Amino acid sequence: MHDVPYTVCPGPEVTAAMAVLSAAIRQSCPRVPLGVQVLCAANQQAIAIALAAGLDFIRAEGFVFSHVADEGIINACAGDLLRYRKHIGAENIQIFADIKKKHSAHALTADVSVAQTAAAAQLFLANGVVLTGTATGHPADPQQLREVKHAVKIPVLVGSGVTLENVKNYLDADALIIGSYFKKEGYWANAVDPDRVKKFMEHISKLRE
């Protein structure tokens, strides 16, 4: 997230750099589930990176329905993305699709609920959906989580705003994507704070008892 402003079609140097970094992380963490996302909406590039680096999943923007993002209009990509995944032999790479994505306006689909968006992503063969708040570090709506869980059978991930204080609101999620809270002072651009990570995971362990 350090190359703002993002472009809709990032250059090949971005894909190359991300592939090298992803491969290095995979080598360091051979048994941990790993994924990649490339902004902005560079989902085919992410699939290629994941295949080359031996990753397990990507996070995809604009999988179903169009929306207006900071970078402009992002159109649905499910058909092209799944065909590309098959074409390069990457069908083992799972696709977790953002729904009603953060940092975006959804007036174009104001008559489509978040649950309906999730159902469409499931119909279009997403392996899971990602529910977020309105921006990085902003919490998702727990009521929307319940609605989406009721609407689909695929995994539902919460992808923003999870903290030590509010994680109990998201225990029904199948997975959590945590960035900001794990950084120093809880700010997304800072370095990871091992103490915050340790404290959070200890709290999760207690909740699981």
Features from the language model and the residues they span:
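Glycine-rich, proline-tolerant flexible connector loops at the mouths of alpha/beta enzymes
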Residues: 1-17, 65-70, 126-140, 185-187
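Alpha-helix-loop-beta-strand connector modules within alpha/beta enzyme cores
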Residues: 6-36, 75-97, 140-163, 195-209
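Catalytic cores of alpha/beta
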Residues: 41-54, 117, 148-178
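Conserved anion-binding
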Residues: 44-125
